[in-house]
Amino acid sequence: MGVTIKYTNNLGGSIEFSNASHIYISTIDGLSSNDISLSESDVINGVGTINTGCTISSKQMTFTGFFTKDKDIHARLLAVILPGVGGKLEYVDTDNDIDVFWEGTPTSTPTFGWREQYTENFQFKFKAFYPYARSNQLYSYSFLETNTTELLPIDLTT
């Protein structure tokens, strides 16, 4: 099946980027990187500094893609990826069992250009305020079916 990317805005509009929709993502910049800022402090009578903490910044992703020239797809991209309206960006890779999402807001609505005679390029930017992907897959663990000695191997009765 491959990779499917779906964007759903907070108003309920959605658009899918996949082989089935004939809207293709060719590159995603910023998908796997995180910007980290370190806080440092000087040490009295010491050499160098010590790390006192770090901040992991929000994630900025740039999506570039193309589609067969179609005014309906063009209009749908503009109708779903709206300025000032947040949403959920889902990334599903069935070949590698990945089903994750980010919540955020577009920082650039789609821009368009010509790719070839019958195809059109597009690009938009999305900022996820929480930089890590979250799983769409629900995991549950039943404590009713678990032997308590597996959880606490220490005898607490003494």
Task: Give a label for each model feature.
Residues M1-T158:
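Extracellular/virion structural assembly segments
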